[in-house]
């Protein structure tokens, strides 16, 4: 998946799932890994990273 698609998926997931978007991407990454789909798992890892970057630093 190219960078533009990754960003589009991340934005859409963040818009639809809000604060749960990163967890959703992580879940899908794990599912792809378990299903023996390393390329798909890598796509979800990148989407998760993009979501994290969009959300910015966590404040505690």
Predicted regions, residues:
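N-terminal acidic leader/helix
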Residues: 1-20
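Acidic, Ser/Thr-rich low-complexity linear motifs
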Residues: 59-60
């Amino acid at each position: 998946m190219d960078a533009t698609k990754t960003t589009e998926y991340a934005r859409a997931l963040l818009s639809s799932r809000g604060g749960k978007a990163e967890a959703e991407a992580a879940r899908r990454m794990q599912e792809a890994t378990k299903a023996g789909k390393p390329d798909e798992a890598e796509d979800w890892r990148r989407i998760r990273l993009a979501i994290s970057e969009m959300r910015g630093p966590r404040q505690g």
